[in-house]
A protein has these predicted regions:
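A short, charge-rich alpha-helical start-of-domain segment used by transcription regulators
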Residues: 1-22, 32-38, 46
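Internal acidic/polar
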Residues: 2, 80-108, 113, 135, ...
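C-terminal flanking helix
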Residues: 21, 42, 119, 123, ...
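Structural recognition of an alpha-helix C-terminal capping motif at a helix-to-coil junction
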Residues: 22, 36-43, 56-68
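Arg/Lys-rich amphipathic alpha helix in sigma70-family domain 2
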Residues: 53, 64-85, 104, 156
Length: 193
């Protein structure tokens, strides 16, 4: 098949490196692993550069490979019986860190931590929908899944994310009230002892 588009490797890397890294980071929750995945994706793209037919095809291909490599990395971790979420909390101190900061100051970090707790398929669908602004049909194509399955993952993922966010917010309010009470020497906010 002949086509007029001539891919430029450096230009494609420049244009898409942040997208590929961001997808890998949101899927794995691990910055170092996301960097490795992004590097692997671009090395593979270099080997398949002649097969890319257009700029849109290159973007689609990069998203698909980034999502697949991220899923592979998560599966390898599971096989080694490493609980990724506990590891993330231990490495990055998410629980202690989020409890110590004001709610609004770290909303992005809190959302990232909650997103990381979702099942892989739901997390993938949400990341592609809300980070990449893809339609359910485009997500289905990227993940090689039926559209109905993608819509289900989106619906269930949002429902689970909302439930976990509500629970997290209640826990934050409870911790904050307890801390404020201790700081006030046992005096409640309405002045009662």
């Amino acid at each position: 098949m002949t086509h007029d588009w001539q891919p430029d490797f450096e230009q494609l890397v420049e244009e898409h490196q942040s997208m590929v890294f961001s997808l890998a980071l949101r899927m794995t929750g691990d910055r170092g692993l996301a960097e490795e995945i992004a590097q692997d994706v671009f090395m593979e793209m270099d080997r398949h550069l002649g097969k890319l037919e257009s700029a849109a095809h290159a973007t689609f291909w990069l998203r698909r490979v980034a999502m697949n490599r991220s899923a592979d990395a998560l599966r390898r971790r599971r096989v080694r019986r490493v609980d990724l979420w506990v590891e993330i909390e231990e490495q990055h101190g998410l629980r202690a860190e989020t409890a110590a900061r004001p709610l609004g100051a770290s909303m992005g970090a809190r959302l990232e931590a909650l997103l990381a707790t979702l099942p892989e398929a739901q997390r993938a669908a949400l990341v592609l929908r809300y980070q990449e602004d893809l339609t359910p049909e485009e997500i289905a194509s990227t993940l090689a899944a039926p559209v109905a399955t993608v819509k289900s993952h989106l619906q269930r993922g949002l429902k689970l994310l909302r439930a976990r966010a509500a629970s997290h917010l209640k826990e934050y309010v409870r911790e904050r009230s307890s801390r404020d009470s201790r700081l006030m020497g046992g005096v409640s906010s309405d002045g009662r002892v």
